[in-house]
Structures are given as C-alpha cells and as structure tokens.
Amino acid sequence: MNKKSCLGCHQLNDEGGRIGPSLNRSSFNYKPEWLYAWISNPQNFRPNTKMPNLGLKPEEARAITSFLVSFQPEEENEEFEAPEGWKQYLSSGGDAKRGEKIFHDPEGIANCSKCHLVNGRGGTVGPDLSFAGTSRTRKFLLESILNPSVVITHGYQTVMILTKNRKFITGIKKNEDESGIDIVDKDGGNLHIPREKIKKFKIQKISTMPGNFKDLLEIQDVTDVLAYLGSLTLPAITNSDN
C-alpha cells in the first residue's frame, strides 16, 4: 500500500489522505472481484476518475485486494457484520422486476430515480448506481437504504454554506476552487457560489437521502429493490485468469 502511495489519497485507520474514499470498510462495502478490477485499471470503469492507473502487475493487484478484504480497523472490536434485524431483508432473493418498478416510479414512496442514475435514466443528486450489483455487496446496499448516513459515498457529501448576506444554501459539493464552490441542489440544479459571497461553509455528516425508508417501505419492497440493484452489473469481472 505505501509503495504505491495509496495512503496519499485513502484513509486506513486514522492514517492517510482524504482525497479518495476511506478503505476501512472495504470488505463490507465492496465485492473482492470489483476491488481487483478497479485497482488494476480504474479508467476501464470511470474514464474521468482522479485515481491513476498504477501500472500494477496482476499479483500486486491481488495482494492489495487480499489485504483490503482482510483489513480490520484498529478501533473496531468486531468484524463488520449485518445487524440481527437485517436478516428479514436478506433472507430471500427478492423480485428484481418489481424492484425496478419501485425504484423508478415517480409517484411511488421511494422514487429512487429522482436522485440516482441507472444507465442514463434518473437524477444526479446521488451516486450513479448503474453497476451497483458489480461493485457493492448486498449488505452495503441494504445499509445505504436503511441508514444512508453511516457511509456517504465519496463525492456526495452535503455542504451547508452561509453567505455574507446571511443566506443558507445546501447541496452536494461537487467542486471547490479559488473561484468558489459548485454544488448540486436537491432538485438536481447546478449552482456556483462565488468565494467572495461565502462567509463560511461546513460539510454535513447527514446524508441528503431520507433515513426513514425502513418505516416507509414494506420489507418486501426493500428486498425487491435490493434484487434490482444486484442485477445492475457489468459484463462478468473475474480474476480467474490472473
């Protein structure tokens, strides 16, 4: 990890950078085959990603993947496990077709596609879920539905800005430079707040995604949405040939 300067951008325990996502929960958040494929060549999946192609040999990518999958943060006393109450959501496979309807129904309670993009369809306030089934574990996807503030996907943190004329502006922070801060508001609109108009701003620890879907949706609804998300895959990613 140190040799390839991973810690320059990524956090492990309390060490490392904050440019990229924390890797403390890699085994819970990501599928091993996705970690291997992403580490090997991230531009294959996101051409505009800031993560460079490290030029890793297959055995190096495998070694880093194995390390991340087995890594346990020092402050954690137990391995990441699904809470007992999650079993009711994870005990069956669910109906992906029904889950797709729930996800994309603009009149439904969930209306997930208002904020999330799937294969060019939906909003951009939240993360693109077009290949969620390839990259994310089922447990992580469930956690993101039931308690979205536990892990806020890197690049989708909410920022609250107080302007010098005492106006509060909230949105997803997309960029910050000398000219100001670019955000996406709750309706998907792009806003640029000039630096000279900003008094102060703070990154919020609460996700913009509602945290009460456990109360709003039936267990079967959540299970079916999970099945739909799990079906959103890229062509098979394997490391069997490496």
Label each residue range with its predicted role.
Residues 1-2, 23-30, 51-58, 103-107, ...:
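Flexible gly/pro/ser-rich segments immediately N-terminal to CXXCH heme-c attachment motifs
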Residues 200-224:
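Intrinsically disordered, low-complexity linker and terminal regions at domain boundaries
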Residues 141-161, 165, 218-219, 223-233, ...:
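Short glycine-rich, low-complexity segments
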Residues 12, 33-96, 100-101, 105, ...:
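Post-cleavage N-terminal segment of exported redox proteins
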